[in-house]
């Protein structure tokens, strides 16, 4: 369920299979590129437009197209876990899904 994306500097990025499937499914290649650039910047410690959504989770807001969102959690300074993604129209549903995925991660990695 968890795919190691890469380590850059001292930050390791993990992707859930849910996040990876969502990103691959995006038809807009420019959107995929913009999202990947934001993830690369996170790995460099530059999080940009991020909003805490509670329970230790945050969303990256990407001002492109329908308003893409990437939901993530962070453990310490070295590990960022990408949970799921969506856009403004599916935000409520995506946040619920992100919370379930985060709970699963925390149970598997106490």
Q: PLM features: what roles do these ranges have?
A:
Residues 1-66, 76-80, 87-110:
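Basic, Lys/Arg-enriched alpha-helical interface segments
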Residues 69-73:
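Short, surface-exposed beta-strand/loop micro-motifs that present aromatic residues
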């Amino acid at each position: 369920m968890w795919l190691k994306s890469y380590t850059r500097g001292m930050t390791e990025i993990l992707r859930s299979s849910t996040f990876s499937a969502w990103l691959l499914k995006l038809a807009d290649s420019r959107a995929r590129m913009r999202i990947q650039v934001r993830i690369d910047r996170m790995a460099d410690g530059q999080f940009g437009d991020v909003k805490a959504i509670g329970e230790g989770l945050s969303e990256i807001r990407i001002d492109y197209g329908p308003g893409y969102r990437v939901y993530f959690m962070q453990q310490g300074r070295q590990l960022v876990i990408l949970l799921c993604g969506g856009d403004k129209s599916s935000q409520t549903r995506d946040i619920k899904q992100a919370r379930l995925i985060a709970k699963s991660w925390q149970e598997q990695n106490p």
